[in-house]
Amino acid sequence: MIVKQCEWISKDAKEAMLIISDGKMQCAAFSHPCYRSAGDVLLEPLLAVSIKNIAKMRSDSQPYIQCLRGSLAHEFLAEVTNLEKSLVVAGTFIIELDDPLPGDISLGDMISFSCGRIDVIS
């Protein structure tokens, strides 16, 4: 995941919105404190905050990330890669959910969900 663009919300407070891309998909993420700039590589998972509408999808579903209404809210279709840490993958994006996954979700399942915001953890 690479920082494509950094838009400062407040330079004094070190708050920024980052556009993050893997060349195929992209998302907007909140960062505070932000020490990132365009071209930086992100190695840590992104954090999906305020998770809603988790649903199991068909195993042959194609992963996607969709920004909702030009905000920091997003909709995802991703593969579950770690149940204990609530980690999912969409393309090369690794996303940690801020809530535990429901009990009927298994490792390798494709799930869809929405979140109120994506945060850069590091």
Over which residues does each language-model region extend?
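Structural detector for short beta-strands of small beta-barrel domains
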Residues: 1-11, 63-84, 113
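Flexible glycine-rich surface loops and low-complexity tracts that mediate binding to linear polymers
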Residues: 6, 39-52, 108-122
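Short, basic/aromatic beta-hairpin or loop at an interaction surface
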Residues: 12-23, 83-92
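Acidic (E/D-rich), amphipathic helical modules within compact regulatory domains
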Residues: 14-59
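Beta-strand/loop nucleic-acid-binding surfaces
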Residues: 21-36, 91-119
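Low-complexity, flexible helical/coil segments
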Residues: 40, 54-58, 78-86, 113-117
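Short coil-to-beta transition motif at edge beta-strands of beta-rich domains
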Residues: 59-63, 108-110
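Glycine- and charge-enriched low-complexity intrinsically disordered segments
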Residues: 69-107
